[in-house]
Amino acid sequence: MVRVRLAPSPTGTLHIGTARTAVFNWLYAKHEQGAFVLRIEDTDKERSKPEYTQNILEGLQWLGINWDEEPVIQSERVAQHREAIQTLLDRGLAYRCYASETELTAMRDAQKAANQAPRYDNRHRTLTPEQEQAFQTEGREAVIRFRIDDAAEIRWNDLVRGAMSWRGSDLGGDMVIARRAPADQIGDPLYNLVVVVDDASMEITHVIRGEDHIANTAKQLLLYEALGLPLPTFAHAPLILNAEGRKLSKRDGVTSINDFRAMGYTPDAIANYMTLLGWSVPEGMEEQFSLCEAAAVFGFDRVNKAGARFDWDKLNWLNAQVLHGWTADHLLEELTPLWAERGWTPPSEKSWCLDLCALLGPSLTLLKDGVDQAEPFFDRPDLQEDALKQLGIEGAKAAMADLLQRLENNPWDGSDVDQAKAWLGDAAKAADVKKGVVMKSLRAALLGRLQGPDLITTWSLLARIGEDLPRLRRCLG
């Protein structure tokens, strides 16, 4: 059975790169009727925090990505990691390196001065017992390094990139697999070693991650071989790029799923767009789809090698499509807590709230637009400059005065739309202006601006809560 994993480090909130990796893993698992599992890689003791773990788990659930087993906590498996390192030491495939940080810095500086690529020169690979004892007598601690044969040919078939080949000489010398510690101990195990041990223990069949891990894959394949562990299949998805074609980073601003949520993006749109970042839809399939619809056709034959540029216009279009497809009930459910954050208390009449949502829904791009556009229905707005200019047009206030008089003589409850339209025409005739002037002026009076949703429905909603007459009186001064 196919088993894939997401292995986030809880050193920050859920990043869109991790979210996209999660989506690809989940889609492949579901397509193959396999298992999607989580491993929390919390071995960075200084930066890992429980609140980040919680944020990652909540973010995945928000996106609609659920896991099939209890998450594995990497820090609880340190004994197994050290056991694997001891096995490598016992087999002569790893050794203790006593080179100090000062010596390693001097080595790298010399390489840089000679225009050489930085790499460890394997200086302590063949220490004699006497040399080791001398370093220990000095009080030196040691890292543990895994031997890498410069002549080694490392090959694998990548599901995205096809045949891949690396030489051992490309990997920077013997690899550190445990941090510095006294010579009679094994220090904290490091990433490449623990990932191999954990993936094998979890029986992961497919490792799906970003292309920035390709060099790690070459190193890890050597460790799989040295430890005699079964090899998974690898797939390296393209990086997510900014508009300039550089790897998306915090410098580009919004990179956290938290940020997207706060901006008013929906989980359906984000999950949809994460799928499109590097995957091409099959011919005949629309670009708006659910994760389950994508899972039915997902495969790595349609995952691109080239980097995926983040396109805000496409994301906004997708989000708008999602919002436009919501019922008024669903939109009201999502907007009610956002309105409450602004201190707004909607009328007790639910039908009014549903009608407001039905009015606003077709114009929304972000969920927070449903807050911005709802504001004049809850708070009486100031008259903006364009509204004041409109009301200053010859005949505009006369038309508003005529309309106000009609409403005071015959209050409108917002239900008879034909009557409202007739009043607009009558006011235009009375003030000797075009009907368009009356409509623009009424919008200015009611909303304080010239842009907004359907005028008659807007007027009806305000009339139903007794807000049309006060706003008309205000505009007349």
Curated annotation (Swiss-Prot):
Residues where ATP binds: 250
Enzyme nomenclature, EC number: 6.1.1.17
Reactions listed under catalytic activity: tRNA(Glu) + L-glutamate + ATP = L-glutamyl-tRNA(Glu) + AMP + diphosphate
Short motif ('HIGH' region): ranges: 8-18
Record's GO cellular component terms: cytosol
Cross-referenced PROSITE patterns: AA_TRNA_LIGASE_I
Keywords, alphabetical: Aminoacyl-tRNA synthetase, ATP-binding, Cytoplasm, Ligase, Nucleotide-binding, Protein biosynthesis
A UniProt-annotated Pfam family: Anticodon_2
Compartment annotation: Cytoplasm
MF-aspect GO terms: ATP binding; glutamate-tRNA ligase activity; tRNA binding; zinc ion binding
Sequence motif 'KMSKS' region, residues: 247-251
Annotated InterPro entries: aa-tRNA-synth_I_cd-bd (IPR045462), aa-tRNA-synth_I_codon-bd_sub2 (IPR020751), aa-tRNA-synth_I_CS (IPR001412), aa_tRNA-synth_I_cd-bd_sf (IPR008925), Glu-tRNA-ligase_bac/mito (IPR004527), Glu-tRNA-synth_I_codon-bd_sub1 (IPR020752), Glu/Gln-tRNA-synth (IPR000924), Glu/Gln-tRNA-synth_Ib_cat-dom (IPR020058)
GO BP terms, alphabetized: glutamyl-tRNA aminoacylation
Record's subunit section: Monomer.
Stated role: Catalyzes the attachment of glutamate to tRNA(Glu) in a two-step reaction: glutamate is first activated by ATP to form Glu-AMP and then transferred to the acceptor end of tRNA(Glu).
Family label: Belongs to the class-I aminoacyl-tRNA synthetase family. Glutamate--tRNA ligase type 1 subfamily.
Name of the protein in question: Glutamate--tRNA ligase
